[in-house]
Every structure is written in structure tokens, then in C-alpha cells.
Regions:
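Surface "functional belts" at beta-alpha junctions
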Residues: 22, 34, 89-178, 207, ...
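Patatin-like phospholipase
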Residues: 11-29, 162, 172-178, 192, ...
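Short beta-strand scaffold segments in enzyme catalytic cores
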Residues: 13-18, 119-123, 201
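Acyltransferase
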Residues: 174-228
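DPxDG-like acidic metal-binding loop motif
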Residues: 59-90
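N-terminal beta-alpha supersecondary unit
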Residues: 1-64
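Residues at secondary-structure transition points
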Residues: 30-41, 69-73, 77, 174-178, ...
């Protein structure tokens, strides 16, 4: 199966081509450019370098969230357009799981900076989620992590390293970028989704919605994602 996998959920852009589990081509760049401008040219370049045609693709696997609102919208819209135009499978995987491309003992905690000392976070062990991905205050993440004997923090860790070291002097802290190759591997055996119903997993309301809700308290909050 020929797979196109990509992630634009953060400042990094990662794109990979796989044939079943074999990596054919991959590129990850962190140049601060608009993903909406860079994504399709990067895909076109990799497909051409691999000697493939767009019609050769059989499955699209995309990081569905959480992450940058704009980045997720770009990725999901592109994935849906390609899947629909080529009439092929579409699969979404966790952006946080895409940061866990390493083999370590214990629990891996991928984080993405959500500003104001908040993060998008997951807890993974042996490649599997043991706690659902969520948006949380980083102080709560540190408290929850105390139940695990050995932890490794990965992802956008730079702004949180001091807090981690204070709470977990023995913890491993690794800055890591999303891996489109891992995204492709994760999506290889997952069932395809309904293209029309496919949406980003934001895990947090956008700021404009937060501000609107402050002046519309009559809205039933059960219909919205929990605010941190």
C-alpha cells in the first residue's frame, strides 16, 4: 500500500511517503513559513522524487490534532481534498503520538506548548496511549506524572524544562519534532474514516470562542470542550 503521511500541527512541517511499512521518502522542516503555502509543494516534490504519480497513492494519513489551529485546518483540509479527489482512504492519528518516535522504558509524555503554561499532552507506554490526549495546565501534568516510576518528556519541552527538572530530577527531557514516518506507520492498519465527517481534534476552544462564551453564559457548557 502506498501511503502519504503528513503533519502540520506545529511550527514543523513533516511529510513522508511509505510503501507498507517501508519508508520511501521523508522531509521535516522547521523554517517558519505558512504551511498552507509549503505543504502541497513539499508533497509534490516527494512524490516526484519517489517516481510516483498522485494516482499511485492508496491512503492518506494525517496528524489530526491537537496543535496549532491554523496548522490543523491546513492539514485536514488538504488531506480531505486529496482523499476525495483521488478516491482513496483517509486516516487520522494523534499529533502527540507522532512525537513519541523513540524506544524508552517507562512512560513517554509528549507535550505541545499551548501558551500560558498550558500544554497539549498525552501519556504513552509501549507506543500506546494510557491516558487520553488532553489540554491541561502544566502544573496538573506534573502532578499526574508523579504516579509513574519513570517518565520521559518529549516534544516542545524548552519552556517547561526547569519545571520538569524541579519535579523530576531524574526524568529524561528530549526535544523532538513530529515524525511523518511514524504517522504513516500508525495509520497503516487503522480503519479509514468518512471523508466528509473528518474534522481536526482541537481539544481546546479557539480564543474567539472563549471570548464569545464569556458574554453568553446562557449557553449550555456541556456542548463545549472543557476550558482550562
Amino acid at each position: 500500500m502506498k501511503i502519504l503521511a503528513f503533519d502540520t500541527s506545529s511550527t514543523a512541517l513533516s511529510v513522508a511517503l511509505l510503501e507498507d511499512e517501508k519508508l520511501v521518502a521523508e522531509t521535516t522542516v522547521t523554517v517558519k513559513k505558512n504551511h498552507s503555502i509549503s505543504l502541497m509543494p513539499t508533497i509534490d516534490f516527494l512524490v516526484a522524487q519517489a517516481g510516483w504519480q498522485p494516482s499511485d497513492l492508496e491512503r492518506i494519513v494525517v496528524a489530526q490534532g491537537p496543535g496549532s489551529y491554523t496548522g490543523l485546518r491546513v492539514a485536514v483540509a488538504t488531506a480531505k481534498t486529496l482523499a476525495y479527489a483521488l478516491d482513496i482512504d483517509l486516516v487520522g492519528v494523534s499529533s502527540l503520538q507522532a512525537l513519541t518516535n523513540l524506544s524508552v522504558d517507562g512512560v513517554v509524555i509528549p507535550i505541545m506548548d499551548a501558551r500560558r503554561n498550558n500544554v497539549y499532552v498525552g501519556f504513552y507506554e509501549n507506543g500506546q496511549a494510557i491516558v487520553p490526549d488532553c489540554h491541561a495546565a502544566f502544573t496538573d501534568v506534573l502532578e499526574q506524572a508523579k504516579v509513574y516510576e519513570k517518565v520521559t518528556f518529549v516534544g516542545e519541552v524548552a519552556n517547561f524544562a526547569d519545571q520538569i527538572k524541579e519535579s523530576f530530577p531524574e526524568a529524561t527531557i528530549l526535544s523532538s519534532l513530529p515524525s511523518a514516518q511514524l504517522i504513516g506507520h500508525l495509520g497503516l492498519s487503522l480503519p479509514s474514516v468518512d471523508v466528509d465527517a473528518f474534522v481536526p481534534h482541537y481539544l481546546k476552544r479557539v480564543e474567539a470562542e472563549e471570548n464569545w462564551l464569556k458574554t453568553h453564559e446562557e449557553i449550555n457548557r456541556d456542548n463545549y470542550i472543557k476550558r482550562v
